[in-house]
Amino acid sequence: MKDFGFVKTAAVCPRVTVGAADKNVDNMLPLIKGAAAPGAQIIALPELCITGYTCSDLFSQDRLIESAETALGRLILECADIGALVIVGLPVRVRGRLFNCAAAFQNG
């Protein structure tokens, strides 16, 4: 595929449980690795898929934001050997403001 300038991409949609970042990462890992195995170079996951989109008031709780950051760290470590660029959505707090963000990582 590279001979023609193409990049193999994959969009994966894991089962998401609202507020359960660790469980959501558990659901993402086999999908990410399954997409990387046949050669996907870019793997995109949904917006806010680490925490779930409909957290509502939970987004104001430090515990949810901290669990999302920890879960992202785990996801990065467990995907270090796949070689693909992975893009995943999560809430990020910066200077007291909450943002709906996408984290992109490759090779840990």
Predicted regions and their residues:
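Hydrophobic structural segments
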Residues: 1-107
